[in-house]
Amino acid sequence: MDETMRRTARAYTRRKFLAFSAAGAAAATLAACGGSTNAPTETPAAAAATKPAGTTGPAPTATNVPQSLGAASTAPAGSVTTGTTGTVSAGSAVAAPTKPANLADKQVLRYLDIEPPTFDPQVGSSPYNMPQIFEGLVTVNWTNNQIEPAHAVSYEANADATVWTFKMRPGLKWSDGTPLTAKDFEYSVKRIVDPKVASKYTAAAENLKNSAEIAKGASPDTLGVKALDDATLQFTLTAPTPFFPLLASTWSYYAVPKHVIDKFGDKWLEAANIVSSGPYIMKEWKHDSLQAFEINPNYWGPKPIITRVECSIFPDGTYLQQGLAAYENNEVDTAQVSASDYDRVVKDAKLSKELKPFPGSSTFMLHWDATNKPTSDVKVRQALSLGFDRKALIDVVLKKYYTDAPTILPPDIPGYNEAAALTGGVEKAKSLMTEAGFPNGQGWPADFTIEYASNATIKLALEFLQAEWKKNLGIDVKLDSRESKAAVEYRVSRKTQPFNGIFGQWGSDYGDPFNWHNFLFASKNEFWPTHWKNDEFDSIIEKAKGMTDKAARAVEYQKAEKILVQEAAHTPLYHGQSFFLIKPNLQGIYHPAILGTVPRGKYAYFTK
């Protein structure tokens, strides 16, 4: 997930590696967090438990994704298991939740976000509120972090996990009553690679057959996805992909309504036109002001208790600060607390009792142009990575709201490698700058600039780095902020144009290193266009992505991580974590480590 202006969840420092699926081997896992935390509120299914409303209980730290091949002997209640044929079926996963007692008469959930740059699942690099109205073949149950069937009731892989076949749930409908079939999913997934759609996230389809040929001009119709009939969808992959169910759960693989797109063109996403497949329909979209959602009468699953979801839209540079004020004024029911407001909230007698921590799987980084002077010199890039006080950044500037990130992969992702970190600190940085021809900053370009999406916390961090580099290395660095959409456009435009530095964040879309190393940093993808290329790195991650031995695969990604960090085209700064205020009578609010930024109405409810 492109974390430009997205809220990231808490990254705990316990070095817990989460397993991932391997064809014919162990079950995959979806990274929930790097350690353990508490789930602050209950869901309807859990509301009948003995603990009082509003208390906390342990949240899962890691959970099994349904196996591609082989079978687990047991599974948690409500989870999905595989049979000996490799088939995954719905089982009890779609049972209606127990209706909680003492429900409030009014069930309207209010929160806030920024104006999404796009609401098209095949275009955007972050889901925003899309999961309120769209759903995929499989989904992640936020109450237990299990991958569960959604529009598909079952799926199976062939012997080497290169072909995945999904069976559709019978009787599916779009919110307007139009039948929803496997052909809708085929159409939608092919949109990811269609140049006319102009996706900012084409790497989501990289594993599908012919994706590379399509990037070179072949027809999107040749992509490795096909509706064998209305009830059967088949994906053909370029290599063994044991983690494919994780990919299929992401927003890029949501079905979108071809009949509406054909009718309305670019206006299909407006509230008056859009139809949906998820638990809600969009009733209003007052741009830069409000998105409102109400229950979808044609949703296949249990109807939510929350009857209306209202997402107030705030300016992207100040929405956290304004959101806190809105929460205190009882204008929203939950709001994230920014790092700059964290101290005040913790010291407030009332607010501190309503503050809840959540796990995370993300990294905030600086990205350097590896072909443009002076950062074309690896010594300069390493010096910038070493030339500041990390402890002061985390403890003083960010007030321990975030955790230090000397390496790029978060601790919860297989391949995490503490030993990959650069060493030597400020003294080494000074020496490297001298070797690179910039002793005490002499000869440094006066217009060296870092671009970033406007955000108060990011601004604080960059101003600290700016001062540190001046003090320690004698160099001047300019800062240039842009609103979120413009920042994304700037990043994309750098594929063919030089730059100095870009601040950017990434949060895991699923708990696998492919979503980091292959997705972001492979020279053929380059999400951040640093123009850095390392043949050894590319070779390692290409080999590792389809390996079925999970331990050996993690070792390969650890090797890749060391190359990535030592080459320093990307400077990791800190791992994300988040704290949310939640009204005492609001239950069922979850923010998982992965894709957990926006609360989902389907789990929530209010008590009296």
Residue ranges, per PLM feature:
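Structural transition elements
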Residues: 93, 375, 403-436, 454-460
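Gly/Pro-rich hinge or "lid" segments in bacterial periplasmic/extracellular proteins
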Residues: 141-142, 146, 219-220, 231, ...
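N-terminal lobe/hinge region of extracytoplasmic solute-binding protein
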Residues: 110-159, 190, 273-276
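N-terminal secretory signal peptides
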Residues: 1-32
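Detector for C-terminal structural segments
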Residues: 22-30, 286, 387-415, 456-467, ...
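Ligand-site clamp/hinge motif
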Residues: 268-271, 297-345
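Ligand/substrate-recognition segments at binding pockets and active sites
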Residues: 35-37, 63, 111, 287, ...
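A structural "hinge/loop" feature
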Residues: 112-131, 151, 178, 240, ...
